């Protein structure tokens, strides 16, 4: 958001200070926009725009607290150019889902070791490389939030679908144990699907999945 509730506290405190008759010397108030979506306002500030030498960050969610620092952020856009690959004869679609994880803010909650469903899905797919064709994968909905829900559709050899789903369920049981303290309600599902369409070529699908597994998540 451009102005969330926590920012509102800081704005109110700053305006109150500017309106007061306190003998503080010169005080400047700095308000920026789009803090959650790219720091556009802060990035547009040019040298000399403000004269003050000391900056107090009033972006706290609690009155009476002042931050001397904040969580950093990095946005990465990765593009994988792939060739559409026809579905192999005898392969059928299976839909996989990891959902209802707790999620959380990528700054405030990143140290709580919560489940990232994108990486959980990628871990399973990595363990099954060579046993499927990737049709699609989608996870997360905000760049500053830990992914709560992820789904993937893969093509699996028809005579291995039951085994593939069984292996996914066994993987799910292990993950539930791994995150039983932080994400007790995380859910998993695997079922046959009527999805149709080409697959991602196997080499790019492999690189894509390996990249998702390798990307750092957490502190």
Give names to the regions the model predicted.
Residues 98, 154-158:
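Short beta-strand-to-loop capping motifs
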Residues 1-4, 89-107:
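Residues forming anionic-ligand binding surfaces in small-molecule and nucleic-acid pockets
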Residues 2-85, 89, 135:
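Acidic/histidine-rich catalytic neighborhood of metal-dependent amide-processing enzymes
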Residues 107, 138-149:
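A structural signal for small-residue-enriched, beta-sheet-centric alpha/beta enzyme cores
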Residues 67, 77-79, 95-100, 107-111:
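FAD-binding subdomain of flavoenzyme oxidoreductases
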Residues 6-13, 117-121, 150:
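Catalytic-loop motifs flanking and including active-site residues across diverse enzymes
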Residues 86-91, 110-138, 158-219:
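Acidic-enriched catalytic cores of C-N bond-cleaving enzymes acting on peptides and small amides
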Residues 2-5, 108-112, 141-142:
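Alpha-helix capping and helix-loop boundary segments enriched in small/acidic/polar residues
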């Amino acid at each position: 958001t451009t102005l969330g509730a926590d920012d509102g506290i800081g704005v109110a405190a700053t305006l109150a200070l500017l309106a007061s008759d306190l003998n503080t010397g010169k005080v400047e108030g700095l308000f920026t926009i789009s803090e959650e979506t790219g720091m556009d306002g802060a990035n547009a500030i040019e040298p000399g725009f403000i004269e003050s030498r000391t900056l107090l960050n009033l972006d706290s969610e609690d009155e009476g607290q002042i931050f001397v620092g904040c969580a950093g952020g990095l946005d990465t856009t990765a593009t994988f150019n792939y060739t559409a690959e026809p579905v192999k004869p005898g392969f059928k679609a299976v839909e996989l889902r990891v959902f209802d994880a707790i999620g959380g803010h990528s700054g405030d909650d990143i140290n709580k070791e919560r489940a990232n469903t994108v990486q959980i899905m990628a871990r399973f797919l990595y363990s099954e490389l060579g046993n499927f064709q990737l049709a699609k994968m989608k996870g997360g909905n905000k760049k500053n939030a830990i992914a709560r829900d992820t789904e993937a559709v893969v093509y699996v050899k028809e005579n291995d679908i039951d085994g593939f789903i069984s292996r996914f369920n066994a993987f799910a049981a292990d993950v539930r144990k791994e995150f039983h303290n932080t994400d007790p309600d995380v859910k998993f599902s695997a079922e046959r699907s009527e999805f149709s369409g080409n697959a991602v070529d196997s080499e790019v699908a492999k690189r894509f999945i390996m990249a998702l597994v390798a990307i750092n998540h957490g502190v």
